[in-house]
Amino acid sequence: MPSLRLLAILTTLLAVVLMATQSSATRTTRRPKPQNTKKPPRGGGTGGGGGGGDQPARLGFRQTTTTMSPSSSLGTDETTEDTMTDAYSLSPTDSTTYAGDAYPTEFHTDSMALPGAGMGNYTLDYSHCYLNVCECCPPEKGPVGPPGERGPPGPGAERAPAVPSETLALMLGTDIYTHTFKIPILLSFYLIGDKGDQGDTGMPGAPGILGKEGQKGDLGPKGEKGETGLPGLKGDLGERGKPGWNGTQGEKGDLGKIGPAGPSGLTGPMGQNGQKGEMGECPTGEKGEKGEAGLPGPPGPRGSVGPPGVNGSNGLPGPVGLRGQLGSPGGKGEAGGRGPPGLRGMPGPKGEKGPKGPRGVRGPKGPQGETAEQIRSAFSVGLFPSKSFPPPGLPVKFDKVLYNEEEHWDPMLSKFNCTHPGVYVFSYHITVRNRPLRAALVINGVKKLRTRDSLYGQDIDQASNLALLRLASGDQVWLETLRDWNGVYSSSEDDSTFTGFLLYADPKA
């Protein structure tokens, strides 16, 4: 580290010597004497005296006044010294003041003046300047040069002790123009002090320009499953969907049991006689049974009247004679007496209904009959909302019992058990929603009644049916849906019910 510092000192001295040589070679005219001016008061003082006003007590002033002699072209300097001392025992210096308007004040900086000094005249102390340049011409502000490239970082050096700000201002002078090089080179090693304390936080700057949108980041890791949120509000009723296609046709069922023989049909009309067939050869058969009596033949002619017989005694009646031939009709005789009533003829056609006769006398009251036993059997069940859309092919679980006092409805099997044979009335009213419906009333596994309702979407419809059926004791009746058509629905506002009751019982044997 000492070798680097020594190398820096030698390099600086060599540069100073070269610059001084060039400056002395190029300067051929003598610097003119400046006009006589008074040194302005420092730190708000009112005179050129020492140490007055707000100036620190350790600083003094030295005022130099120059007067021109008429007998000589050269001026004679008369110096009035006011001792200027400070903590570092600096020697008194000669200073010459210039008018405040000699140069533009736009090149002055507040960092060159002591605290409290205004934008007035500034004095440059030449005793601390080893390199003299021409200050005859007023400086002109040249164009700003291009920024230079940043040099490589230096090796660094040990930091020298800091110089107090008052001493540094005194060593450099308070009237320093920014365009001159009259700064002591030997003080360059003392400009860098120790690192000071951190200053107060400055005011926040203006917000910067919005940067470009960054690239999309990588997909982050999957977070943990959050807690279940509160149930949302019920949404509005959606639009009605398009009608769906009809369900696929089910497979053909197994062959059912052979049913009982139906009643005989009516006798058909007699067909026409066929053509006479050829006479076939047939051996003589056995003698058949006696046929039925034929129809009576036509009456024969009336016989002639025989001679009158002798009046004899009553003899035995003779045999019945042969029926004589029908005689020719005789002339109209005289009306004879009324003969005896003949045999009863064939019944004639039914005559017209005669007028209603008078009401007869009321008969006596009959004896009291036996008390007939009243037979009852009925049920009525519904569907809870939780059992909506039941599985097809099975009895619908009607678990909401509305009436079942005779307990002929089995809630476990969802079937009605017939106890009293007779004629029953069955009806069902089914609410249909969201899905189509195909329901069937089943008796002992045989579908007796079917209902269809093709409905899709959020609309609600009702499917119902009613029938009279004769049941025998032990028969079972239930309601079931078919495949893909199980749109049975129930809610707090809509019900699906199944009802049955005995209309009249069969008479007991």
Curated annotation (Swiss-Prot):
Single GO MF annotation: calcium ion binding
**Which Gene3D superfamilies does the UniProt record give?**
2.60.120.40
Q: Which GO terms describe its biological process?
A: otolith mineralization
Recorded superkingdom: Eukaryota
- Which residue intervals are annotated with compositional bias (Low complexity) in the record? 302-322
Q: Domain C1q: where? A: 372-509
Collagen-like domain spans which residues? Answer: 193-244, 285-329
Which key words are in the record?
Calcium, Collagen, Disulfide bond, Extracellular matrix, Glycoprotein, Metal-binding, Repeat, Secreted, Signal
Its annotated function is as follows: Collagen-like protein, which provides an organic scaffold for otoliths onto the sensory epithelium of the inner ear. Acts as a scaffold for biomineralization by sequestering calcium.
What does the subunit comment say?
Answer: Homooligomer; disulfide-linked; probably forms homotrimers. Interacts with otomp.
Which family does the record assign?
Belongs to the OTOL1 family.
Q: What is this protein called?
A: Otolin-1
